[in-house]
Amino acid sequence: MAAAAAVATISAVQVEFLEFPAVVTSPASGRTYFLGGAGERGLTIEGKFIKFTGIGVYLEDKAVSSLAAKWKGKPSEELVETLDFYRDIISGPFEKLIRGSKILPLSGVEYSKKVMENCVAHMKSVGTYGDAEAAAIEKFAEAFKNVNFQPGATVFYRQSPDGVLGLSFSEDVTIPDNEAAVIENKAVSAAVLETMIGEHAVSPDLKRSLASRLPAVLSHGIIV
């Protein structure tokens, strides 16, 4: 009798009309990443929840062994309530690629203003905001100045363990060959992901997705 095929631990995620593939390769970094989780980001306006962005967090394969050491065997219900789990994703010694694709049109200035406000508020709250971070935030703002996001357009954030934040922009979901800006500031880089999945997360949906998907990967490895 033939052995049963291994059950996939990684699959694509659909957020509105946006599909987040299970695995992507970045021509900018030459690395391949698996989809940790994806979810929507929105705001309640006049009593109605409006979805603006779909966010996907992709992780380098070495994230599995790094996270499994502490979190393997933990159920989703526990992980989703555990801030340290998300902080270990944010600060872990592996590369991340965050994809933010627009559901509604948004100017780069509007989008980046909110991201920067959240990042600065977090850094000030934990005491990591100084002159170097202020300069890095200015560079972040400059990168978005001439960008206008139509539905489906995307910003990619590449985060390296040594604190480099690479930004690239696409009119669709194609990862560009070259990055539009590179910001070398560990506190700012970490703050971008912290504001998405940390204590005051802009996407609780993304947090739930990470907590529901990663236990299988940590227990059985990456199976596509």
UniProtKB/Swiss-Prot annotation:
Pathway: Secondary metabolite biosynthesis; flavonoid biosynthesis. Pfam families: Chalcone. Signal peptide: none annotated. The record marks Y111 as: Important for catalytic activity. Gene3D superfamilies: 1.10.890.20, 3.50.70.10. InterPro entries: CFI (IPR044164), Chalcone_isomerase (IPR016087), Chalcone_isomerase_3-sand (IPR016088), Chalcone_isomerase_bundle_sf (IPR016089), Chalcone_isomerase_sf (IPR036298). Transmembrane segments: none annotated. SUPFAM superfamilies: Chalcone isomerase. Keywords: Flavonoid biosynthesis, Isomerase. It is an enzyme of class 5 (isomerase). Catalyzes the intramolecular cyclization of bicyclic chalcones into tricyclic (S)-flavanones. Responsible for the isomerization of 4,2',4',6'-tetrahydroxychalcone (also termed chalcone) into naringenin. Belongs to the chalcone isomerase family. Part of the biosynthetic pathway for all classes of flavonoids, a large class of secondary plant metabolites, many of which are brightly colored. This is Chalcone--flavanone isomerase. It comes from Pueraria montana var. lobata. The lineage of its organism: Eukaryota, Viridiplantae, Streptophyta, Embryophyta, Tracheophyta. The gene is CHI.
